[in-house]
Amino acid sequence: PSYVSLDSALALHGLIPERVEEVTSVTTGVRRRFDTPFGVFSYTPLPPHRYAPGMAWHEGEGGPFLAATPEKALADKVWTDKRFSPASQNDFDAYLHEDMRMDPDQLAELDGEQLAAVCRAFASRKTDMLARFLGRSRRTHS
């Protein structure tokens, strides 16, 4: 099983400004990459207990597909990005706003309850810090 996530889902939801050339998905299987006439498809493994919640069906040109919600895509990205090792919540400011070029207003609109549910499923220090950072940002952004 797999669902569209990471950069592809972040772009789908308008959270990152860049055009994504590769369809990025998360799977309970193994890491894979396929170069096809239709494009490049990559699959990043995620442990089964971190696989849900946070997915929804979307209608695409080729039919319906399963994709991460904005909150799930962000948690998937943070958890799978091995280059990002936050020492504190403050590290998320540079990562989200400078490295990922995410708009603070759009981040403030994320569903806090859904993000908390996703982060609880991850049971990870990185995603817990993400939820706390975004909760703090929403309070100061209001």
What label would you give each PLM region?
Residues P1-R50:
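Short gly/ser-rich loop at a beta-strand->alpha-helix junction or flexible surface loop bordering the NTP-binding
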Residues G54-S142:
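Hydrophobic alpha-helical interaction segments
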